[in-house]
Amino acid sequence: MYKYIWILILIIFTGFTSCNKPPKFSDDDSLKIAFSTDTVAFDTVFTTIGSSTRQLMIYNNNEENLKISSIRLEGGNQSQFSINVDGLSGYKFSDLEIYSKDSIYVFVRVTVNPNDQNNPFFIEDRLIFETNNNEQTVTLTAYGQNANYIIANQEIKGFPKFKIIADSLQEVRWNAERPYVVYGYALINSYGTLVIEPGTQVHFHNGGGLWAYSDGQLRVEGTQENPVVFQGDRLEDFYADEPGQWDRIWLMEAREGHGHSIEHAIIKNGFIGIQAQCFEKTNRAPLNIHNTIIDNHTGIGIYTNLYHIKASNFVVSNCGNYAIALTGGGEYIFEQGTVANYWKKSTRTTPSLFFNNTYQNPFDGNLYAYNFNFEMNNCIMYGNQEEEFETEFHAGPDTTYIFNNSIIRTKRIDNDTNYYKCLFNVNPKFVNKELNYHLDTLSPAIGLGNPKYATGILQYDLDEVARGNNPDAGAYQYVPIVEE
């Protein structure tokens, strides 16, 4: 009996010792590792701001285990790239074991050093791998972009952190030489003016925005060829259509004769495109919006509170809440515009267009009702909700709204005096309802407009196509395709 027990113990011990034999690694120089790519490429990256992380996979497709004797950045510790190998950060790693049919993760980032160039510049490095005296490389590339950095340095209770970029009685101009990258809010102080010249690119970090305080002035002076663009500060392709990357353009009341103006701008991928609201007093100067696209905001495209707006040749598209919310009363004229809300990032339960005439005073907290007057001419207001128009008016003040020669998605057709020569719940037939709001061949918006609203600066559409005597509804005039 004891004899068999000792034999069993010996067998078990032999099994354990055989299991604990160290793995063997081949030194055959004909065996090589493989990679998921031969080049890790980054999109344009602002100097001093780190990039997102790229992933590189190392594969051992051989039947034998291998030992990578060295992984290193050719630029060493001076490289603008950084790597993380299996959870460890550094610029050089030694003796990494990779078993047969196994893999190793390598994560790569880049932080570009600033220089004196205005245009994007190319940087490059190499990852060098040595295995059994074989040297293999993976190229790392990126484009760096110098920028003007605006970093918030002041804070007042109840307001976001900000930096004054145009102080009282000061006119500041931003130009297109280098992009502007804003952390926090860039603030235009009372009686200050910011002029943004054609082609300027303004990028906001998460939560950042542009803020014109009471009696300050913003003038955006883009052109058809060189619009001014407001967007987030992540330049990778992944973020190109990602909403909610920054906060908003926030415009308080301007002084008479010095109203805000936005011409040829693209405002995209924020929380609110434009928030225009009275703060200390009733607005005395209109906000003029012309030839401007406001697209892809998680909240609202245009949000107002007791304001005066004239908007023309505009597109407001794809917003997670209202496309346009005009609240607290005010005076509004919208002409030759397209509101197209086909938001798909989340469930939208609000209409594209909302009106009310009540305003909560920020100082005494009381709710007040004000006059509300709205006019929409030669426009399209459509979306993927069955009801895209809602009002909430308190009795007392004058409240009027009228739509002329427009396409509207609504069931609120309860008063003929509010609508003149409009089409209801008729698909406007865009070229692409999510991406391209030009009119398709069979669009009912073709010829729907009234020529009296297409005069002056509105003789030409958002693409500077002449409308002639038969204008279409919306921001874009239909142009027939000429077959050769």
Segments predicted by a language model, with ranges:
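Beta-strand/loop edge motif enriched in small/polar residues
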Residues: 20-25, 33-44, 49-50, 93-435, ...
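Short, solvent-exposed loop/linker segments at beta-strand-coil boundaries, enriched for Pro/Gly
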Residues: 74-92
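Sec-dependent N-terminal signal peptides
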Residues: 4-13
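Extracellular interaction modules
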Residues: 134, 467-471
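Asparagine-centered strand-capping/turn motif at beta-strand->loop junctions
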Residues: 58-62
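Short acidic/proline- and small/hydrophobic-mixed sequence motifs that coincide with surface turns
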Residues: 51-53, 63-68
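C-terminal motif of bacterial Sec signal peptides marking the signal peptidase cleavage site
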Residues: 15-18
